[in-house]
C-alpha cells in the first residue's frame, strides 16, 4: 500500500486504503477492456489498492477484467466482490464464491459482501461466509445496502457480529447515513464503504462545490471525495475506467479544507436532521 493513502482499520485490525477503485460497468464493452485494465493497474500503482467488484457487474465480466488486471499482482491488492442475494443460500454462497474466484483468477477474496438483503435467511448466509473463511476462500465478509435495522438483525444471528464492513450509497448529496448508520458502524469499529461517492457525476455542477474546489486548485470530484475521506472509518470507491481520472481521484487525499469551507458545503448539501431510509442505486 502506498504510504500516502490514508488507511481505515477493519475490525480484525487490518489496515486498508480509504480510497479505492470501483468497477461497476467495467467489462460491458469489449472495446473498452484494455483501458479498463490500465485504469485498474494505475490504481494499484498509485496506492489505491482496494479494488471493488461484484458478480452482478456486467454478469461477471467485471470480475474477469479485474482478474486480468491483477495478474501477477494479487498480493498487492485488497480484493472485494459481492454475491447476489438470491445466490446467498447455504450451498449457493459457496458456489457463487467459487465462480467469482475463477473469474478473478484468485484463490481468495479479502472481503466478500452480500450485495443487498434478499429472501435467503441471514443465518444461512452468515454460516456459509464463515465456512468460506475456514476454507481460506475469503478472509472477511460483510454486507452492502444494509440500514441500521438490517444491521441489528444481522448482529442477532450467530456470528453476525463478525461482519467486517457495510457498503452503502453515501456522498454529499445523500448524507442520510450520517444520522444513524454511520455512527452505528463507527461505534463497532466497522468501516462504511461509500459507493457512487460523486453521485455518478451528477453533483459536479453544483456551484458551491465548483467555487470551493477552484480555491484549492482542485476539481469538484476531488472535493467530493475529500468530504468522504474526512469521515472516520469511511472508504470511498469511485469508479473510473480512465487512468487519468484515477490520477485525478487520488489527488483528493492532498486537499486540506478549512472549517469555513466545509460549512459552506454543509449549507449546499445539508446533513440530515432526521432519519432517512437508506437509499440504493
Provide a role label for each language-model segment.
Residues 1-77, 280-281:
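N-terminal binding-site loop/beta-alpha segment at the start of enzyme catalytic domains
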Residues 7, 117-281:
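Beta/alpha (TIM)-barrel catalytic core signal, keyed to glycine-rich beta->alpha loops juxtaposed to Asp/Glu
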Residues 10-11, 45, 67-75, 98-107, ...:
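Acidic (Asp/Glu)-rich catalytic clusters
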Residues 15-19, 47-50, 74-77, 106-110, ...:
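Short, well-ordered coil/turn segments that N-cap beta-strands
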Residues 22-34, 81-91, 115:
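Active-site mouth loops of central-metabolism enzymes
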Residues 30-43, 89-104, 124, 151-152, ...:
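Short, acidic/polar
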Residues 76-88, 111-115, 145, 168-170:
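A short, structured active-site edge motif that brings together acidic residues
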Residues 104-120:
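Active-site groove signature of glycoside hydrolases
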Amino acid at each position: 500500500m502506498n504510504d500516502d493513502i490514508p488507511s481505515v482499520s477493519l475490525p480484525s485490525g487490518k489496515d486498508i486504503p480509504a480510497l479505492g477503485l470501483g468497477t461497476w460497468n467495467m467489462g460491458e464493452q469489449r472495446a473498452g477492456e484494455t483501458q479498463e485494465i490500465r485504469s485498474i493497474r494505475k490504481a494499484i500503482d498509485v496506492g489505491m489498492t482496494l479494488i471493488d467488484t461484484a458478480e452482478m457487474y456486467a454478469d461477471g465480466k467485471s470480475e474477469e477484467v479485474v482478474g486480468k488486471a491483477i495478474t501477477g499482482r494479487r498480493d498487492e491488492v485488497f480484493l472485494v466482490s459481492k454475491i447476489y442475494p438470491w445466490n446467498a443460500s447455504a450451498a449457493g454462497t459457496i458456489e457463487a464464491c467459487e465462480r467469482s474466484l475463477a473469474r478473478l483468477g484468485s484463490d481468495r477474496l479479502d472481503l466478500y459482501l452480500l450485495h443487498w438483503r434478499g429472501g435467503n435467511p441471514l443465518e444461512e448466509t452468515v454460516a456459509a461466509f464463515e465456512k468460506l473463511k475456514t476454507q481460506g476462500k475469503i478472509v472477511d465478509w460483510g454486507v452492502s445496502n444494509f440500514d441500521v435495522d438490517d444491521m441489528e438483525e444481522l448482529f442477532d444471528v450467530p456470528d453476525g457480529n463478525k461482519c467486517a464492513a457495510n457498503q452503502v450509497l453515501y456522498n454529499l448529496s445523500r448524507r442520510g447515513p450520517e444520522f444513524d448508520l454511520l455512527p452505528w458502524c463507527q461505534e463497532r469499529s466497522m468501516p462504511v464503504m461509500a459507493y457512487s461517492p460523486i453521485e455518478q457525476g451528477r453533483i459536479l455542477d453544483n456551484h458551491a462545490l465548483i467555487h470551493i474546489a477552484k480555491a484549492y486548485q482542485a476539481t469538484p470530484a476531488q472535493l467530493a471525495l475529500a468530504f468522504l475521506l474526512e469521515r472516520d472509518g469511511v472508504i470511498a470507491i469511485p469508479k473510473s475506467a480512465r487512468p487519468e481520472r484515477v490520477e485525478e481521484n487520488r489527488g483528493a487525499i492532498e486537499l486540506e479544507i478549512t472549517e469555513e469551507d466545509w460549512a459552506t458545503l454543509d449549507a449546499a448539501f445539508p446533513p440530515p436532521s432526521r432519519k432517512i431510509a437508506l437509499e440504493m442505486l
